[in-house]
């Protein structure tokens, strides 16, 4: 063994140590040929349609995307890009100009397939415009973003994979942003409900000799009611009525607390200015 290594080292001129390679085996030439072709043989061809289901169908089950993403034009183009990746992933030497040409053909085929239903597209466009959603053709703007990001020497397989993943993550990001906006609106609504409905019940416990009456017209009033309710309700925000019976010791404290809590919100700020002034006037009188 030592003599063999020394002889091979002498033949190579002392620059490298040449070791004998093992037999490649029956399957290794096929694997080498598949690697030279770009890996487009075998199970990779069947995986590409599964990519479409994994990156679009499954997220659409988990998170409902906006309405314009359900259009037939957008889905057909996205699916044809996946098929384009499947058909041409065995040719890794194609550059970006051919990719752009193939994308133009795909767009033309998708537009031609949908030209027969012009009335449906017009009705869908009108419905999207009425609901405030962007048109389905705005989905092509993602192509311009991909064209600016990808390099000139990028192969079609890498570009198509990048585009599919980019579109899938764009759908998910759009849906997450929509959920965040919905949560923010729900938070505002819950805050208004807390300040208008829950806070008066906390600061105005039932059972007492005094009643506090808030209104935008007659501001804040302390009346000796003796347990009877004020006949005319006070409207502050919608149908929210703040008329609660409190004890004499809690009247001023609850009034100032309600004024401070309500005036923090811009909607209620103009409505509780008079209440705050009335509370300070009653405080000076007290």
From Swiss-Prot:
Major location category of this protein: membrane
Which locations, inside or outside the cell, does it occupy? Answer: Membrane
Q: List GO terms (cellular component aspect).
A: membrane
**Keywords, ordered alphabetically:** Membrane, Transmembrane, Transmembrane helix
- Record flagged with keyword Cytoplasm: no
Source taxon at top rank: Eukaryota
Topology in the membrane? Multi-pass membrane protein
Annotated membrane-spanning segments are 68-88, 161-181
What family does the entry list?
A: Belongs to the FAM87 family.
Could you tell me what this protein is called? Protein FAM87A
Q: Which organism is it from?
A: Homo sapiens
């Amino acid at each position: 063994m030592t003599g063999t290594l020394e002889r091979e080292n002498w033949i190579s001129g002392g620059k490298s140590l040449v070791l004998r390679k093992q037999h490649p085996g029956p399957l290794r030439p096929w694997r080498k040929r598949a690697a030279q072709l770009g890996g487009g043989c075998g199970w990779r061809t069947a995986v590409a349609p599964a990519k479409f289901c994994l990156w679009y169908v499954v997220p659409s089950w988990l998170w409902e995307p906006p309405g314009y993403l359900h259009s037939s034009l957008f889905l057909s183009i996205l699916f044809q890009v996946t098929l384009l990746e499947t058909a041409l992933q065995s040719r890794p030497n194609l550059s970006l100009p051919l990719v752009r040409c193939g994308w133009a053909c795909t767009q033309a085929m998708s537009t031609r397939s949908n030209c027969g239903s012009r009335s449906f597209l017009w009705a869908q466009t009108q419905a999207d415009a009425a609901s405030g959603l962007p048109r389905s053709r705005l989905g092509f703007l993602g192509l311009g973003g991909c064209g600016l990001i990808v390099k000139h020497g990028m192969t079609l397989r890498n570009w198509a994979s990048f585009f599919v993943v980019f579109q899938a993550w764009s759908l998910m990001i759009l849906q997450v942003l929509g959920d965040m906006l919905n949560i923010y609106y729900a938070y505002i609504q819950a805050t208004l409900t807390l300040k208008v409905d829950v806070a008066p019940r906390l600061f105005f416990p039932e059972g007492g000799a005094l009643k506090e009456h808030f209104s935008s017209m007659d501001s804040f009033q302390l009346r000796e009611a003796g347990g009877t309710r004020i006949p005319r309700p006070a409207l502050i925000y919608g149908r929210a009525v703040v008329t609660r019976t409190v004890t004499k010791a809690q009247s001023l404290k609850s009034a100032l607390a309600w004024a401070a809590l309500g005036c923090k919100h811009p909607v209620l700020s103009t409505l509780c200015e008079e209440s705050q002034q009335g509370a300070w006037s009653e405080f000076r009188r007290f």
